[in-house]
Amino acid sequence: MLVKFSKASEVKPSEITSKAFYLDRRRFLMTAAVAGAGAAFGTIAPPVFAAQGNPRVKLSGVQKSKWTQEALGEELTDYGPITKYNNFYEFGTDKTDPSEYSQDFKTKPWSLTIDGAVEKPGVYDLEDFLKPHRLEERVYRMRCVEAWSMVIPWVGIPLSDTIKRVGIKSDAKYVAFETLLDPEQMRGQKRPVLKWPYKEGLRIDEAMNPLTIMAVGLYGEVMPNQNGAPFRLVVPWKYGLKSGKSLVRIELTREQPSTTW
């Protein structure tokens, strides 16, 4: 069976969040708020883990890609809003909960299980697994279903590079992603806000698209805990809820996986 992977230019228009839909939803939510129904607003040689207390740590050897700020033609969102206004329900549902309650989140050591329809399933040390890859900066606009967006300079590697290393079986059709389940560290998981752990999925062609990345940082620095440390998925043509954070498992499947949303 020949598995064909889409090029970045082959993402179907129907799968991209349209600007019109985004703006219409934004207008609707703003109107609702006014009416009283709204709500509050190189190679990886250095560590790829946020240190205790979540200080800012530079990543070395980050290369520019063709997905630059100049190519996008938009201003970058400041570091402050990116790291202080977050959806990461594992730490709480308020926008400031992730930055407040993730400071002591331990991301080292970190293991990643890759299994399912692959040739070399296993449990991998994340830092060792990433070492052969060169980091790239990718500037993408991330849109939230809540009608806000940010332009973020992510640092990471193509997800396809990760999957290719373990070998894709010809009958793999989907890729499932699973976030860490640890209520002692992630206070939000003590409440049944969602069915834990958080799960998401992509079709195999979406996962292998060169735009889809495993991000390990932003603004040239190690990924902050509240943004999904030590690594997260970034799928720029989908809403942010499709990009799982603090991932511990990637499974290639033959059947469409169940997801949180």
Language-model features and meaning:
Residues 1-23, 27, 34-37, 41, ...:
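N-terminal secretory signal peptides
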Residues 53-261:
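Structured, non-membrane catalytic/scaffold regions adjacent to prosthetic-group chemistry
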